[in-house]
From Swiss-Prot:
Keywords: Hydrolase, Multifunctional enzyme, Purine biosynthesis, Transferase. PROSITE patterns: MGS. It comes from Thermosynechococcus vestitus (strain NIES-2133 / IAM M-273 / BP-1). This is Bifunctional purine biosynthesis protein PurH. The IMP cyclohydrolase activity resides in the N-terminal region. Its EC number is 2.1.2.3, 3.5.4.10. Pathway: Purine metabolism; IMP biosynthesis via de novo pathway; 5-formamido-1-(5-phospho-D-ribosyl)imidazole-4-carboxamide from 5-amino-1-(5-phospho-D-ribosyl)imidazole-4-carboxamide (10-formyl THF route): step 1/1; Purine metabolism; IMP biosynthesis via de novo pathway; IMP from 5-formamido-1-(5-phospho-D-ribosyl)imidazole-4-carboxamide: step 1/1.
C-alpha cells in the first residue's frame, strides 16, 4: 500500500495541492473524513474515508470520527519496535506516516458577538488535538502538519530527501504541541468567564497561563545586544496588532513600549475632552496639553518641553489633520498615533518618510492585567482604572479651589497617573509646565518639576502620585507660586502639609487614591 497520510482540516487552504502532490508524486494513500474527504473527492483526488478504513461509522453527529485503534495505532506505532510491528499486523493496521490536521475555529467562534455556550462547546475539537498529540509524540516516525504554511516545506523535504528529516519532524512536533496548548488555554479562559457570569471575572486564577503567537521578530530589544520578539494574544488582532502603519519602518521594541505609554495617557482625554496631544520619552510624558484645535494642542504639548520632545512619541485624541501634520513634520519624531488620519495629512507626512505614523481607532482599549517577570516566576496585577470623581475628593485646606483651578487639578491628576514614581506634574492652562519623574524622593521630583516650569508655575497647580511624607514639598510649591495641589493624602504628617498650604494660601485636595508606577 505504500505510505499513508491522514488529512482532517477545517482550513482548506492548500489542501488540494498538498493532497495531489502526495498522491501523484509520492504514491501516498490518503485517509480522510467529513468535509475534508468531500473536498478531496470533489477535486478528483482518490481518498479512503476513515469509516471505510476502520469499519466503524461516524457517530454522534460527527463527534466521533477518528477515535479508533486503527487510526491511533497507525500513528503511535514505533517502526523500530518488533512488538509494535507485530501488533499492527495482528490488527490489520497500516502505519500512518503523515498527519495533517488543523482544529475547529474555537477562538474565532467565541470572538463573535452573542455566541452561546452551546455554540462554543460544539467548536471544541476532540479528535483533532488527539491526532495532533499522537503524531507529535511519535515524531521520530511520523510528520505532523498543523498549518498550511508548512505544506510546501514538507513537500520539498520529500523531493530532496525522500522523507521528512528528523529536524523537520521535531520542529513540526514543537509547533503542534504549542498549538494544542494555545487551543486548550483559549477553552479554559472562555469557560472560566462563563463560570463567572454574573460575578466579577476571575483575572487572578490559581493557575495563570500566558501564551502568544509571534507576530514579529524585532531588530533588538531595549538595547542592540538584546534579542526580542513581539507576541500577540487571541485569535483576532487587537491592540497594537490591530494598528495600521501608514508609513515608516517596522516598529521597534522601544517604540511599542512608548506607544503603549502614550496610549495610556491619551486615553484619559477621549470622549468629550477637547483636542489633546501627548508626547512620550522613555515611557514618561514630557508634554501634555489640550487646545481649541488639534494642531494647537500638539504645539502646546511640544512647547511644554521642546528639548525632550525631540525623538518622541506623539499620541493624538482626534483624527490627524493637515495642519497638525504640518506641525509634526517640523521636528524629528519617532512615532505618531491617532484614531484616524485625514487624506489631506498623508502627502504632508510623506515629507518625513522615516516618521512612523499609525492609526488605532480603539485607543481606549487597555489590557486587563499587567505582568512583570521576576526570578523564578512573574507577578500579575489587575489594571483597574479608578474613575476620576471630584465629588469624592476632599478639600483639606481653608482655601477651596475655584472651578477653574479644580479643572486644572483634574488635568494634572490625569497626567501624573502615568508618570514613573516618584512623580510630580506642574500644569497651567491645561498644559504641563514641568514634570518630575522617577525620583527616589518626592521633594526631589517636586524640585525638578518646579525648576522645569520656572515662572509658568506661578498660578498653576501641582499633582503628586503619592502623599507628601513631609511639608517640604508644599513649602517648595509655595515659594514657586503654586495655587493648588492635588495628592492622595494618607501620610502620618498630613497635618504638617495642610498647615504649610494654609500658611501660603494654597488650596489642597486629597483624592484618597495612590498612583504609584514602577
Amino acid at each position: 500500500m505504500g505510505r499513508m497520510a491522514l488529512l482532517s482540516t477545517s482550513n482548506k487552504q492548500g489542501l488540494v495541492e498538498l493532497a495531489r502532490a502526495l498522491v501523484q508524486e509520492f504514491g501516498f494513500t490518503l485517509l480522510s473524513s467529513g468535509g475534508t474527504a468531500k473536498a478531496l473527492q470533489t477535486a478528483g483526488i482518490p481518498v479512503t474515508t476513515v469509516s471505510e478504513y476502520t469499519g466503524a461509522p461516524e457517530i454522534l453527529g460527527g463527534r466521533v470520527k477518528t477515535l479508533h485503534p486503527k487510526i491511533h495505532g497507525g500513528i503511535l506505532a514505533r517502526r523500530d519496535r518488533p512488538q509494535d510491528e507485530a501488533d499492527l499486523q495482528a490488527q490489520a493496521i497500516h502505519p500512518i506516516d503523515l498527519v495533517v490536521v488543523n482544529l475547529y475555529p474555537f477562538a474565532e467562534t467565541i470572538a463573535q458577538p452573542n455566541v452561546t455556550l452551546a455554540e462554543a462547546i460544539e467548536q471544541i475539537d476532540i479528535g483533532g488535538p488527539t491526532l495532533i498529540r499522537a503524531a507529535a509524540k511519535n515524531h521520530a516516525h511520523v510528520t505532523v502538519l498543523v498549518d498550511p504554511s508548512q505544506y510546501e516545506t514538507y513537500l520539498q523535504e520529500l523531493r530532496l530527501y525522500g522523507d521528512a528529516q528528523p529536524a523537520f519532524r521535531l520542529a513540526c512536533a514543537q509547533q503542534a504541541f504549542a498549538l494544542t496548548a494555545h487551543y486548550d488555554q483559549a477553552i479554559a479562559e472562555y469557560l472560566q468567564k462563563v463560570t463567572a457570569a454574573g460575578t466579577e471575572p476571575e483575572i487572578l486564577p490559581p493557575v495563570f497561563h500566558l501564551t502568544g503567537r509571534q507576530k514579529q521578530v524585532l531588530r533588538y530589544g531595549e538595547n542592540p545586544h538584546q534579542r526580542a520578539s513581539w507576541y500577540v494574544c487571541g485569535a483576532h488582532p487587537r491592540g497594537w496588532a490591530a494598528a495600521h502603519l501608514l508609513q515608516g519602518k517596522e516598529l521597534s521594541y522601544n517604540n511599542l513600549l512608548d506607544l503603549e505609554a502614550a496610549r495610556g495617557v491619551i486615553s484619559e482625554f477621549l470622549g468629550d475632552s477637547p483636542p489633546a496631544a501627548v508626547i512620550i520619552k522613555h515611557t514618561n510624558p514630557c508634554g501634555v496639553a489640550e487646545g481649541k484645535t488639534l494642531v494647537e494642542a500638539y504645539e502646546r504639548a511640544f512647547a511644554a518641553d521642546r528639548v525632550s520632545a525631540f525623538g518622541g512619541i506623539v499620541a493624538l485624541n482626534r483624527p490627524l489633520d493637515g495642519a497638525t501634520a504640518e506641525a509634526l513634520t517640523r521636528t524629528f519624531l519617532e512615532c505618531v498615533v491617532a484614531p484616524a488620519c485625514e487624506e489631506a495629512a498623508l502627502p504632508i507626512l510623506k515629507t518625513k518618510p522615516k516618521m512612523r505614523v499609525l492609526t488605532l481607532p480603539e485607543l481606549h482599549r487597555a489590557p486587563t492585567t499587567a505582568i512583570q517577570t521576576i526570578a523564578g516566576g512573574f507577578l500579575v496585577q489587575e489594571i483597574h482604572p479608578l474613575p476620576i470623581d471630584p465629588e469624592a475628593w476632599q478639600v483639606v485646606t481653608a482655601t477651596e479651589p475655584s472651578p477653574e483651578l479644580m479643572a486644572e487639578l483634574i488635568f494634572a491628576w490625569k497626567v501624573v497617573k502615568h508618570v514613573k514614581s516618584n512623580a510630580i506634574v506642574v500644569s497651567r492652562d491645561r498644559q504641563t509646565q514641568g514634570i518630575g519623574a522617577g525620583q527616589m524622593n518626592r521633594v526631589g521630583a517636586v524640585e525638578i518639576a518646579l525648576s522645569a516650569a520656572g515662572e509658568a508655575a506661578r498660578g498653576g497647580v501641582l499633582a503628586s502620585d503619592g502623599f507628601f511624607p513631609f511639608a517640604d514639598s508644599v513649602e517648595a510649591a509655595a515659594l514657586a507660586g503654586i495655587a493648588a495641589i492635588i495628592q492622595p493624602g494618607g501620610s502620618l504628617r498630613d497635618s504638617e502639609s495642610i498647615q504649610a498650604a494654609n500658611a501660603a494660601g494654597i488650596a489642597m485636595v486629597f483624592t484618597n487614591q495612590r498612583h504609584f508606577r514602577h
